[in-house]
A protein has these predicted regions:
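Tubulin/FtsZ superfamily GTPase core signature
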Residues: 1-226
Length: 226
């Protein structure tokens, strides 16, 4: 597996979420929407055009196929409670807030032409937070099923300021050991948070977020989410 760590772009990449009848406030490089039968096609298209959206990304929280998924450039599968984290982790892949990370051009390269994306994460606080966070997302990783090979992987690590190279290397080794793929390009991002959902200021914490991008050439499959 190839690992890529690059200098982040200084350009601001705007990521926003579509809501019914929302008025765009400038250009969005990425617009997210949560897939459902309630999506108004015409209004979604209006917002996409108004926001000059480069990538319209659907978030699917069920195994059901919704007609609105046909409008999306990409579909990220996750559980309902992961929706806010999906958007946060995706935006911070190229936010310039991390030590290592991706440029916006690399994010576009990773997702372009590959519609289906699976989101996994593990999070923990306390003394052994890195180990526990890894155990969480690896157990999910081992239960995945898809008819298509993994083409690219984007990983975002959120951690408190005590996080160092040793912990980072541990996570990377665990991923290399358990993600059995060939010819996949893997990108890493590391961002520090004094406070996060699972830890307060002064506490230790780690959240590992993974976007698995499938080589789904037919662009018609849905990933069976666990």
């Amino acid at each position: 597996m190839e690992n890529n760590s690059s200098v982040l772009d200084s350009d601001i990449v705007k990521v926003d979420k579509y809501e019914p009848h929302k008025i765009a406030n400038g250009k969005n490089e990425v617009t997210f929407f949560v897939a459902s039968d309630e999506i108004d096609f015409a209004d979604l298209q209006r917002y996409r055009i108004q926001a000059q959206t480069d990538y319209l990304i659907a978030i699917s929280t069920t195994n059901k196929y919704y007609d609105c998924l046909g409008l999306a450039d990409n579909v990220i599968s996750c559980s309902t409670d992961e929706v806010p984290l999906v958007m946060q982790a995706f935006q911070r892949l190229h936010s310039g807030s991390g030590i290592i990370g991706m440029s916006w051009d690399e994010v576009k390269w990773a997702i372009s032409g590959n519609k289906n994306i699976e989101f996994l994460h593990g999070v923990a606080g306390g003394e052994n937070c890195v180990t526990f966070a890894c155990e969480q997302f690896i157990s999910k990783l081992q239960r995945l099923s898809s008819n298509y090979p993994i083409k690219n992987v984007m990983i975002n690590m959120f951690a408190d300021i005590s996080f160092g190279c040793e912990q980072q290397d541990f996570i990377i080794k665990q991923i290399d050991k358990n993600l059995m793929v060939k010819d996949a390009t893997t990108f890493y991002q590391l961002s520090f948070f004094d406070e996060f959902a699972d830890w307060k200021s002064g506490e230790r914490g780690c959240c590992v977020c993974m976007f698995l991008i499938y080589d789904d050439k037919s662009n018609d499959s849905l990933i069976k989410h666990i």
